[in-house]
Swiss-Prot record:
Compositional bias per record (Basic residues), positions renumbered to this chain: 16-26
GO CC term, one of those recorded: Prp19 complex
Biased composition (Basic and acidic residues): 122-149
Organism, scientific name: Saccharomyces cerevisiae (strain ATCC 204508 / S288c) (Baker's yeast)
Keyword Nucleus: yes
Protein name per UniProt: Pre-mRNA-splicing factor CWC26
Chain intervals for the UniProt region annotation (Disordered): 1-37, 118-149
Localization, UniProt: Cytoplasm; Nucleus
Family: Belongs to the CWC26 family.
């Protein structure tokens, strides 16, 4: 195929040359055309090689794009292609607005339907942990029976008693029925109006302003007038400061009385 024919097919027929130009210019233009023809031939050969390479590259890029659109489900090991939905940009101006609304309304429905096919139901136990597919779902296996709960409570009580001391164990071994009897008897004695006519000192109980029981036997005084509680064992454990304080106060008061009585009237 001649170069002139190729150029005429690709770029169209050449324009007629001006006949008024001189012959010298024509000879120079012929020489320049020969040089340009050689350059064009070289460029054509390089362009063909580049097109062949680009064609191979385009095929490889197209294959890569196809492979990117393919995704694998790890649970079922199945390959599937991504679904392409017609977007608003691909729609031509000839289509109406109603078609656009229908397509946009169908897009979320299709995606939800596809997700429901691929996803599987996840089962969880009472604590929120996932259950494997092999294990069957059984409510009785999750909920503990009453017998197991009672056994666990007995085990906890046994461990508590095992770690307790003798004094704590003695406090535990009190019958609840006796407690109720004592409470009812105390309530009856409080509510009975005839108790005011009796003179039994044992039934009168000393209480503080807050209603707490006080020590019913004689106890040493202190400068704050605080009485010991009912649980005091009667052992005096102070360093003797309170006794010295009261002795000093008595001495000061006696001196005041003596100084007043020994005064002479003038």
């Amino acid at each position: 195929m001649a170069l002139h024919q190729y150029l005429s097919e690709t770029y169209g027929p050449t324009k007629p040359k001006n006949k008024t130009k001189k012959k010298k210019k024509e000879s120079k233009s012929d020489a320049n055309s020969d040089k340009t023809s050689l350059i064009v031939k070289e460029r054509l050969s390089t362009l063909q090689q580049e097109q062949e390479k680009s064609g191979v590259a385009s095929f490889s890029k197209f294959d890569k794009q196809k492979s990117k659109n393919i995704w694998k489900n790890l649970e079922t090991n199945e390959l599937s292609h991504a679904i392409t939905h017609p977007s608003a940009s691909s729609i031509t101006g000839n289509e109406s607005k109603n078609d656009l609304k229908e397509i946009r309304a169908q897009e979320p429905l299709v995606t939800v339907a596809d997700k429901s096919k691929t996803r599987k139901t996840i089962y969880r136990d009472a604590q929120g942990h996932k259950i494997q597919e092999d294990s069957k779902i059984d409510d009785s296996s999750f909920s503990r029976s009453k017998y197991e709960d009672e056994k666990a409570a007995e085990r906890e009580q046994y461990l508590k008693n095992l770690n307790m001391g003798d004094v704590q164990k003695l406090g535990i071994n009190v019958d609840a029925h006796d407690k109720k009897k004592n409470q009812t008897a105390s309530s009856l004695t409080i509510e009975d109006p005839a108790i005011t006519f009796t003179h039994d000192k044992e039934r009168t109980v000393k209480t503080s302003l807050l209603g707490r029981k006080l020590y019913d036997k004689p106890a040493p005084e202190n400068r704050f007038a605080i009485m010991p509680g009912s649980r005091w064992d009667g052992v005096h454990r102070s360093n003797g400061f309170e006794e010295k304080w009261f002795a000093k106060q008595n001495e000061i008061n006696e001196k005041k009385v003596q100084s007043y009585t020994l005064q002479e009237d003038y």
